[in-house]
């Protein structure tokens, strides 16, 4: 059984985001706040959505020198989000520094997740653009092992890799998987995709779903369909 469906609120403004969330009068979705919304509205939007009772995945994908990431994570830890992330390509030293910065004085912290390869990346673009010639699944497994060794809680990966990650790193190591679409839906710019039911079957812990819910004619019904396929 999947742990939860995370709704990617990729809106450009506070007004659009809150208008969308106002539709959900029952179960409050776990919300992903990405770069567009965070850069437009700042920490205030995180605090406001949190105050409404939503869990939050703050998806900023930090990637910089270790000390800079450590200081940034120390600031993010004050926002009381539930999950945040960084790029595994930043090295184990950066990931360890991030954990140190994210951990509060009382020892608590949000879950910290590493991004491996974006679901918009395929083998051809990885080789031609990034000059990484290993098979994409091997790269994901390598990044997963590095993240686990650094002490992180899991990774963001394609649902196609979730089962293999659990085999390598254990069931405790979380997999958060975007690239999820309904069987009758448009895949958009995602190149490695799977349905909610298939992601559940293969062992994804969380799925991140954006446009199939946010752009649906009935977002609440689309969300409930996702929950039914993945969580129930």
How would you label these PLM feature ranges?
Residues 3-9, 31-33, 56-60, 84-86, ...:
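Hydrophobic faces of well-ordered beta-strands that scaffold small-molecule active sites
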């Amino acid at each position: 059984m999947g742990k939860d469906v995370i709704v990617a609120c990729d809106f450009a403004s506070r007004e659009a985001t809150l208008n969308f969330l106002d539709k959900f009068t029952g179960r409050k979705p776990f919300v992903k706040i990405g770069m567009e919304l965070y850069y437009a509205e700042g920490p205030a939007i995180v605090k406001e959505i949190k105050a409404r009772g939503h869990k939050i995945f703050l998806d900023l994908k930090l990637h910089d020198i270790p000390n800079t990431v450590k200081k940034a994570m120390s600031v993010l830890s004050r926002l009381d989000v539930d999950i945040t992330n960084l790029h595994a390509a930043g090295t184990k030293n950066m990931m360890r520094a991030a954990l140190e910065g994210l951990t509060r004085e009382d020892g608590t912290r949000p879950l910290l997740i590493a991004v491996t390869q974006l679901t918009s990346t395929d083998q051809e673009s990885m080789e031609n653009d990034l000059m990484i010639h290993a098979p994409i699944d091997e790269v994901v497994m390598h990044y997963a092992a590095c993240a686990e060794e650094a002490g992180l809680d899991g990774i963001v990966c394609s649902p196609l890799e979730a089962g293999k990650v659990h085999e390598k790193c254990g069931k405790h190591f979380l997999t958060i998987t975007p690239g999820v679409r309904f069987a009758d839906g448009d895949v958009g710019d995602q190149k490695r995709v799977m349905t909610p039911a298939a992601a559940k079957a293969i062992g994804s812990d969380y799925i991140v779903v954006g446009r199939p819910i946010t752009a649906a004619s009935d977002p609440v019904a689309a969300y409930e369909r996702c929950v039914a396929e993945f969580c129930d």
